[in-house]
Design a protein with these regions (language model features):
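C-terminal binding/interaction regions
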Residues: 4-6, 10, 90-143
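Residues at secondary-structure transition points
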Residues: 9, 13, 38-41, 45, ...
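Short helix-loop-beta junction
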Residues: 20-28
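Short, structured active-site "lid" loops
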Residues: 45-64, 68
Length: 143
């Protein structure tokens, strides 16, 4: 399993903290940017990069961060097959992973979430395979 990371300037330092935590826990990741703090960067660029990477690598997840998490979630969810979810509590993470098979976790840097607990829940929670959940997930990809 691999995790693709992305963040704009408001999420940059949270992303850097996440990278350190992932490395300390021997979890493979790829940083899709921004690589340096740039107060003028744009969140859609990094959300697109993470969404494309997750779609191309079926055994992966994404983590996106911006100030509120709203912008990166909106951008990522424009991609068919991406199910990006904004979560602030571990129970929300478990619910969206199990019921919705979320594949990108969106974090609000302005709220300084307890990101280790959220990431652990995201990684550890499998998607349920019940027909009703799969039916609903399939409907997300309809036009």
């Amino acid at each position: 399993m691999k995790i693709y990371l992305g963040a704009d300037h408001r999420g940059f330092y949270l992303k850097e903290d996440i990278k350190a935590w992932l490395a300390a826990n021997a979890i493979e990741y790829i940083d899709c940017g921004n690589q340096v703090y740039d107060a003028e960067d744009d969140f859609p660029d990094f959300a697109k990069a993470v969404a494309r990477s997750v779609l191309a690598d079926s055994d992966s997840f994404g983590i996106l961060a911006c100030g509120s998490a709203q912008g990166v979630a909106m951008q990522a969810n424009r991609f068919k097959g991406i199910r990006a979810a904004i979560c602030r509590e571990a129970e929300e993470v478990r619910e969206t992973r199990s019921h919705n098979d979320a594949n990108i976790l969106c974090l609000a840097a302005d709220n300084a979430p307890d990101f280790p607990a959220l990431i652990q829940a995201f990684i550890a929670t499998p998607a349920l395979t019940d027909e009703k959940y799969q039916r609903r997930i399939n409907k997300l990809d309809e036009e």
